[in-house]
């Protein structure tokens, strides 16, 4: 992970890795993409995802494991992107209101907000989780992006907006998966 200048070793079953270059033992990557079902966390390949799209089935998420800027800077970037025309407003300048699903919602002040932005805050007031969802009617198929850290890595998750209410389960499933992947790498010679 380039920004933090560190590596996190993981070991996952090959079925989760689509690309041949990901199957090389000891390979080092700056990021890794996974695609799984929302309900059972089973891996889904590109062909299967394409077929599901064709049939109107969207019960899946993708997540990228990598390295990004600090969560507070990320929260500011996501908020500004959702609230165009507000200039260089930082996360700390947005008022937060209570929202459903144990989240706080940013009160966007721009003339035409594009997304709703939600947060969970850590003890120090810095966002632990950022969830950004398209506002219905702004795009044909609204989705959500969710950002958090797990096992020393930054995670970006993407799923359809209907799954937003399950954001905690999604985060717990990914956290458990990555925790197992890190632990498995300690038990192997990588």
Residue ranges and their predicted role:
Residues 135-190:
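Long, compositionally biased interface segments
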Residues 1-95:
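Charge-rich, low-complexity N-terminal segments
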Residues 6-8, 127, 153:
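Short acidic/polar mixed-charge low-complexity motifs
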Residues 90-140:
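Signature of long, low-cysteine stretches enriched in small and polar/charged residues
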């Amino acid at each position: 992970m380039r920004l933090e200048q560190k590596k996190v070793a993981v070991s996952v079953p090959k079925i989760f890795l689509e690309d041949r270059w990901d199957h090389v033992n000891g390979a080092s990557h700056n990021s890794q993409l996974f695609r799984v079902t929302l309900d059972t966390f089973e891996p889904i390949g590109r062909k299967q995802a394409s077929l599901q799209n064709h049939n109107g089935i969207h019960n899946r998420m993708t997540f990228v494991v990598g390295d990004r800027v600090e969560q507070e800077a990320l929260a500011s970037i996501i908020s500004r992107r959702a609230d165009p025309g507000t200039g260089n407003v930082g996360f700390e300048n947005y008022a937060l209101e209570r929202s459903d699903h144990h989240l706080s919602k940013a009160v966007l002040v721009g003339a035409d907000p594009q997304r709703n932005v939600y947060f969970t805050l850590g003890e120090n007031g810095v966002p632990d989780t950022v969830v950004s969802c398209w506002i219905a009617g702004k795009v044909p198929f609204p989705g959500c992006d969710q950002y958090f850290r797990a096992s020393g890595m930054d995670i970006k998750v993407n799923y359809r907006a209907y799954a937003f209410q399950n954001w905690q389960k999604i985060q717990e499933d990914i956290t458990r998966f990555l925790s197992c992947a890190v632990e498995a790498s300690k038990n192997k010679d990588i």
